[in-house]
Amino acid sequence: MQRTMLKSKLHRATVTHSELHYEGSCAIDESLLEAANIHEYEQIQIYNVSNGERFTTYAIRAARGSGVISVNGAAAHKANPGDLVIIATYATYNELEMARYAPELVYVDAANAIVDTRQTIPVQAA
């Protein structure tokens, strides 16, 4: 059996740029890509916490340490500078891989600097 699972997440990143007239993608600070195990040109899902938009694009590299999260091309209509977003990737795992499965969860501050990394999400209470 194959299962599609969360592979990685950048939690509550702040959009720094929104470039409509740019080749479509989302530029992400290279240090954030590495911390979250997101590869350049990998498909990403973006969930805009500020306006509820959800969309798919791909990741490209921004300068290391820049804090850049730039939503580009048509997706720029769905995110503005200052918006909070969750950026997620998913992968398919077989039963043997599931025994070792753990997502890469990266938490950032308002400047998109890493403040925490985890491999589990705490139990949520209503």
From Swiss-Prot:
Post-translational modification: Is synthesized initially as an inactive proenzyme, which is activated by self-cleavage at a specific serine bond to produce a beta-subunit with a hydroxyl group at its C-terminus and an alpha-subunit with a pyruvoyl group at its N-terminus.
Chief localization: cytoplasm
Domain of life assignment: Bacteria
Transmembrane segments: none
Reaction(s) catalysed (UniProt annotation): L-aspartate + H(+) = beta-alanine + CO2
Keyword terms, alphabetized: Autocatalytic cleavage, Cytoplasm, Decarboxylase, Lyase, Pantothenate biosynthesis, Pyruvate, Schiff base, Zymogen
Enzyme class: lyase
GO cellular component: cytosol
Active site annotation, chain numbering: 25, 58
Pathway connected to this protein: Cofactor biosynthesis; (R)-pantothenate biosynthesis; beta-alanine from L-aspartate: step 1/1
EC number: 4.1.1.11
SUPFAM superfamilies for this protein: ADC-like (SSF50692)
Localisation: Cytoplasm
Entry's Gene Ontology molecular function annotations: aspartate 1-decarboxylase activity
Binding site for substrate: 57, 73-75
Chain positions found as Pyruvic acid (Ser): 25
Cofactor: how bound: Binds 1 pyruvoyl group covalently per subunit.
Assembly and binders: Heterooctamer of four alpha and four beta subunits.
Function in brief: Catalyzes the pyruvoyl-dependent decarboxylation of aspartate to produce beta-alanine.
Protein name: Aspartate 1-decarboxylase
Organism field: Thiobacillus denitrificans (strain ATCC 25259 / T1)
